[in-house]
Amino acid sequence: EDGGKVHFIVCDNRDEEQVKNMIAEVIEKFGKLDGLVNNAGGQFPSALESISANGFDAVVRNNLHSTFYLMREAYNQWMAKHGGSIVNMAADMWGGMPGMGHSGAARSGVDNLTKTASVEWGRSGVRVNCVAPGWIISSGMDNYSGDFAKFIIPSLAGNVPLKRMGTESEISSAICYLLSDAAAFVSGVTLRVDGAASQGTRMYPLADASNSHSFNGFHRAFIPDVLKDQIGKAEQQSAQAQDANKD
């Protein structure tokens, strides 16, 4: 039904030794390591003044340290001699990340780490890039509560020129491109997949978008509860607009 085969390895990506062992196991089992996607991460909403030292450290280790460990081991154990492609995950952190300052600090580090590695490891035929998702519909949104879930998440689409949020498939497509030979001369790039949200300005009000359609290639994808009402109405309006255009 889903196609392909997957091999699972349990690993705490914040633990250096576990990461070393995981990369070694992958190479032993498959005989090579062509590509690495650092897609593990996480954070929690909090004002800066309320973040404890442990909380800040946990988010930075989960997003930045783990990325470094995996990049380094993939390079040292395989890619230094054979080449390869690495894709890291950041976020739209260029304008700051109010309410998630710990995550913004870590993601900014990932962006710079990507650029540094692309220069240092280019001699080995290793391309290193990064994807910076904007506001993406995912099950993780249901992990938030309070005002963040009630007011902030439902308001996000209104701040995107395409007037919608992205899908997980649209992020995966960007990752697949950067991993592929089609991007053989692309390295040191952080690709923003955000519907141009990062280019907006309050001086220019956004008009309604009538022809913005998403790509969703995951048959198991589902709408998080916090967005079901909003997305249901948007899909209905989109269908009505398409029917009107046909007429």
Where are these regions (language model features)?
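Short C-terminal tail/terminal secondary-structure segment
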Residues: 176, 187-247
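Substrate-binding pocket helix/loop in short-chain dehydrogenase/reductase
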Residues: 47-48, 52-60, 152, 156
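Short, small/polar-rich loop/turn modules that mediate ligand/substrate recognition or access, typified
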Residues: 37, 122, 127, 186-188
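Alpha-helical segment proximal to the catalytic Tyr-Lys
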Residues: 76, 119-120, 184
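A short, exposed helix-loop element centered on a Lys and neighboring polar residues
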Residues: 71-72, 115
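C-terminal substrate-recognition "lid" of short-chain dehydrogenase/reductases
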Residues: 68, 164-193, 198
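Catalytic loop of short-chain dehydrogenase/reductase
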Residues: 87-110, 114-123, 136, 197
